Amino acid sequence: MKIIHKGLVEYLPTFEAMKTFNAGRNADTEDELWVVEHPPVFTQGLVGKPEHLLIRDDIPVVQIDRGGQITYHGPGQLVVYTMIDFKRRKTSVRNIVSALENSIIATLAEYGIEAAADPKRPGVYVGERKIASLGLRIKNGSVYHGLALNVNMDLSPFTHINPCGYAGMEMTQIADFVQPCPTPDEVAAKLTAHLETQFTPKADNNE
């Protein structure tokens, strides 16, 4: 699995690059993790309802092809796009989602933060507050899009939406629990290591 650090990049070109990568991949294409941050942007999923955008401001809204409702990305949030051929790995999308959740939970545990997945709601939570979001697109036996983990960011734009379609959803981030707060790059090093641990055995065990 190749890990590519792209830094702070605009959302729309990254979205187009994901679609191009997925459309052009073949049986020999190596899976990739893209580690990024984005300037402020709201992204609206395939089944997204306009009423979940509560306040219109100068933050752009981009309609995209992942599942789920509206969410927010901004500087200080770690985003990892998971370009994974799940058919080749002989696994399921549910297992990929679990691997993402488990990797986030293990990463947060390294900072002393007790987090958990919720079987009724996508994402990872600290108590009732959401710290990470997940969203995937399934196409041609592969997935793309991925996860967003709040590290040290301005959370106020989340109050302009119903995050992932849930009214009143309270958001949190690593900076609320850890000071000095690690940088997104420091968190990315731990998170990608956990992702490799989650995914590599699955490939090896099914060869």
Swiss-Prot record:
Task: Name the active site residues.
Answer: 164
Functional pathway: Protein modification; protein lipoylation via endogenous pathway; protein N(6)-(lipoyl)lysine from octanoyl-[acyl-carrier-protein]: step 1/2
Gene3D superfamilies of this UniProt entry? Bira Bifunctional Protein, Domain 2
- Might you name a Gene Ontology BP term for this protein? protein modification process
Q: Which Pfam families match?
A: LplA-B_cat
**Annotated ranges, domain BPL/LPL catalytic:** 27-203
Q: Name one GO cellular component term.
A: cytoplasm
> What EC class is this?
transferase
SUPFAM superfamilies per the UniProt record, alphabetical? Class II aaRS and biotin synthetases
Q: Which reaction does it catalyse?
A: octanoyl-[ACP] + L-lysyl-[protein] = N(6)-octanoyl-L-lysyl-[protein] + holo-[ACP] + H(+)
Q: EC number(s)?
A: 2.3.1.181
Query: Sorted alphabetically, which PANTHER family does this protein's record hold?
Result: LIPOYLTRANSFERASE 2, MITOCHONDRIAL-RELATED (PTHR10993:SF7), OCTANOYLTRANSFERASE (PTHR10993)
Misc note: In the reaction, the free carboxyl group of octanoic acid is attached via an amide linkage to the epsilon-amino group of a specific lysine residue of lipoyl domains of lipoate-dependent enzymes.
Biological function = Catalyzes the transfer of endogenously produced octanoic acid from octanoyl-acyl-carrier-protein onto the lipoyl domains of lipoate-dependent enzymes. Lipoyl-ACP can also act as a substrate although octanoyl-ACP is likely to be the physiological substrate.
By sequence similarity, the record places it as follows: Belongs to the LipB family.
Stated name of the protein = Octanoyltransferase
From which lineage does this chain's organism come? Bacteria, Pseudomonadati, Pseudomonadota, Betaproteobacteria, Neisseriales
